[in-house]
């Protein structure tokens, strides 16, 4: 196996960085090629405003002020994504050299799922929000790395890194806590003293408390709306939590498709579980008082359920639950933990079992390119609808003056015939795309139509006249100088079966 022996050779810091940078850039190539304006990107690019501070994310406003040399939020895509991906590659390199004293190429790949999270593809779809979310991952990793050397003296630095990560994207907290769980597993496996274990845990709790306090002081006073409200504790709360967990479990299960991925996921999960159990049993053999062994043993047992909980984490507890893929940032750390435990289970100096690590990463990279093509298909459909609407509005405006046009019904099911066959093969694509619209009012100024506004219902006492124009995807009503553009609820099947 000489051609692939280089995979087992130790890499320098520079070589590790180039490997992780290349892999990271390769993962975002589909988004650069698709160049798709996604959801909130429409109104943000149209208004050149982000309004992230009122969502508890002032760091994103600051990011665009710095990169855009302005007080607004100008669309700079893809520059912010390229820059933040490069910074994340630096942090991933530091993390790989933290986990392994002399990391090989395969060792470096173990930390790659911090970015190679299939659910993070939806985050990367946002041209505005995506770079801030990538940077939040970078800062979460840095918070961990500043927690491990001289823990007590570096607590305030790590807390600042953590607060900065939360100011960019709050679910980054799930990533940091997940990294702390992996760190505890590594410490137990390395047979560190109980005093060292408890000192590290105490330091991490202090960092979390300080980071949350700093973030609360800087961001929470400016938050508007009810996004931070927690779920009401009542009789229906447990049922609501159970429904949310079941829904997320069903979506995560969509990832495992095909015999190869099923086999890969099963083997890595089983091996990682066995390794976790072996570390736990070895813990009971420590030459320490029984109460200490039992205490650390129970803390150790909590790490696995906690890693699973952190897939969605605190978003499960919010009153306004967001069931979308972009909130599942913690899934990345669950994959890192599984790959790390799998690697630690492989016999020393053996390459063949470790090559198995490449399979899930290759699958996630493949999914990224498939998803990029789906984004391109959605972009083409949206552009067609917007141009068709613009043409019809322009034709109607020649016979009468339309002072105002209301757009209604732009939230629809995921209807994308061009991607239906791909979704049948990869069911998770529909959950990742999650575009419940054909076009948005903010998309029409790109076609020269600037008097379109969104509304949900006709004004009180006003009834729509019979449509003057009916198209397959929408219809147009007129009332004096006001037009009503109603997107239809599409019932046609998406499947396309050409006759041969």
Where do the language-model regions lie?
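Central hydrophobic cores of alpha-helical transmembrane segments
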Residues: 109-113, 157-163, 300, 353-362
